[in-house]
Swiss-Prot record:
GO terms for biological process: selenocysteine biosynthetic process; seryl-tRNA aminoacylation. Consists of two distinct domains, a catalytic core and a N-terminal extension that is involved in tRNA binding. Keywords: Aminoacyl-tRNA synthetase, ATP-binding, Cytoplasm, Ligase, Nucleotide-binding, Protein biosynthesis. It is an enzyme of class 6 (ligase). It comes from Alkalilimnicola ehrlichii (strain ATCC BAA-1101 / DSM 17681 / MLHE-1). ATP binds at R263, S264, E265, E350, I351, S352, S353. Pathway: Aminoacyl-tRNA biosynthesis; selenocysteinyl-tRNA(Sec) biosynthesis; L-seryl-tRNA(Sec) from L-serine and tRNA(Sec): step 1/1. This is Serine--tRNA ligase. Belongs to the class-II aminoacyl-tRNA synthetase family. Type-1 seryl-tRNA synthetase subfamily. One of its GO terms (molecular function) is ATP binding. Catalyzes the attachment of serine to tRNA(Ser). Is also able to aminoacylate tRNA(Sec) with serine, to form the misacylated tRNA L-seryl-tRNA(Sec), which will be further converted into selenocysteinyl-tRNA(Sec). HAMAP family: Ser_tRNA_synth_type1. Its EC number is 6.1.1.11.
């Protein structure tokens, strides 16, 4: 949520920034609503004071033996006016609230202009895509050759499309990736491992920005409890700070969390229907940071580097791109996507998004830190990134490390987790 003081002081400036990402703020309507809100707040307070004064007068008049019926009628009329004013004030406040929660974050000035992912800007590349002396197979074909290590038919029987069953060494490789990622981030990058629920309430999803706008992307449990399956560990981990005031000495907070993630992929009909690239259930190791406001841009670069380290240790070619305004997530001020090379597709595909949300999520969550200079609680800054998406990392390993006979070499970094297995 944006700072409402900034909105009221400079709605035109906010509108210009929002227009960069395709959001139109009707400044005249917003100003009129806000002015009406102030008028109604004054009016309700005046009516409340007047009714209180007249109510006291009834007792005094009664003690003097005067006729109190006219005063009672006046108090009743003031009560009706007060209720009407309160109702109108609530309606105006509700409309303003809907505007506030529906506004995306302001893009950082460095974010490139653009309408969609085709206009994202490449920042850097690492590694060289492998050259094969044979036609490279995709991960689906490789999974079939590896003793049915990836079984999409079984998953379709159990559940439906966009799921997978893993078996044997492929399943172990998947688990090894999770352990390797968590070990690296906790031992080398200073993150604390955290385990969280895989179901959250509406307040948590509102805090990180998934609700109310993106309800169609979520799985809601049809049960007595009003819970949702998490689309990412970002939701429960970031909400650890909701309604909290964190001491300055505790910052930065850095968490690494492995969870399954659940997404309906409502807007992805017909996209990536083959294999593991886009699934309803997938594993991810998420990195979350909560920092002082002045530290968040440096933290974004560091967090992105932490995610890149995993790919470098696995010797997987990748590139980093800055998302343009049209591809930027709702809550983000700036996002780097890390895209890994997939030989079968002959292209780079997203494996991590690393974002700085500034104080946008913190304002929605009332997540604050106590500024030692002022002694007052202020919104902190939140960041997160995938470190990494485990399924897509598995796909990248299968395709980049494949051999002509369909077997797959295990990357050196994962061999300590594979119990002596060096080839699948």
């Amino acid at each position: 949520m944006l700072d409402t003081r900034k909105l009221r002081q400079d709605p035109e400036g906010v509108a210009r920034a929002l227009a960069r990402r395709g959001y139109r703020l009707d400044v005249a309507h917003y100003r009129a609503l806000d002015e009406r809100r102030r008028e109604l707040q004054v009016r309700t307070q005046e009516l409340q004071n007047e009714r209180n004064t007249r109510s006291k007068g009834i007792g005094q008049a009664k003690a003097r033996g005067e006729d109190i019926e006219p005063l009672k009628a006046e108090v009743a009329d003031l009560g009706r006016q007060l209720e009407a004013a309160k109702g109108e004030l609530q309606a105006v406040q509700d409309e303003l609230h809907d505007i506030h929660v529906g506004m995306p974050n302001l893009p950082h000035p460095d974010v490139p202009e653009g309408e969609d992912d085709s206009e994202n800007v490449e920042v850097r590349r690492w590694g060289t895509p492998p050259e094969f002396g044979f036609r490279p197979r995709d991960h689906v074909e490789l999974g079939e050759l590896l003793d049915g290590g990836l079984d999409f038919e079984a998953a379709a029987k159990l559940t439906g499309a966009r799921f997978v069953v893993m078996r044997g060494a492929v399943a172990r490789l998947h688990r090894a990736l999770i352990q390797f990622m968590l070990d690296t981030h906790t031992a080398e990058h200073g993150y604390q491992e955290i385990y969280v629920p895989y179901m959250v309430n509406r307040d948590s999803l509102f805090g990180t920005g998934q609700l109310p706008k993106f309800a169609a992307d979520l799985f809601h449990l049809d049960a007595e409890q009003d819970y949702y399956l998490i689309p990412t560990a970002e939701v429960p981990v970031t909400n650890m700070a909701r309604d909290e005031i964190i001491a300055d000495g505790q910052l930065p907070l850095k968490f690494a969390c492995h969870t399954p993630c659940f997404r309906s992929e409502a807007g992805s009909h017909g996209k990536d229907t083959r294999g593991m690239i886009r699934q309803h259930q997938f594993e991810k190791v998420e990195l979350v940071q909560m920092v002082r406001p002045e530290a968040s841009w440096e933290a974004l670069e560091a967090l992105t580097g932490h995610a890149e380290t995993i790919l470098q240790r696995l010797d997987l070619p990748y590139r980093v791109v800055t998302l343009c305004t049209g591809d930027l997530g709702f809550s983000s001020a700036k996002t780097y996507d890390i895209e890994v090379w997939l030989p079968a597709q002959e292209t780079y595909r997203e494996i991590s998004s690393c974002s700085n949300f500034l104080d946008f999520q913190a304002r929605r969550m009332q997540a604050r830190w106590r500024n030692p200079e002022t002694g007052k609680p202020e919104p902190l800054h939140t960041l997160n990134g995938s470190g990494l998406a485990v399924g897509r990392c598995l796909v990248a390993i299968l395709e980049n490390y494949q051999e002509a006979d369909g077997r797959v070499t295990v990357p050196e970094a994962l061999r300590p987790y594979m119990g002596g297995i060096t080839r699948l």
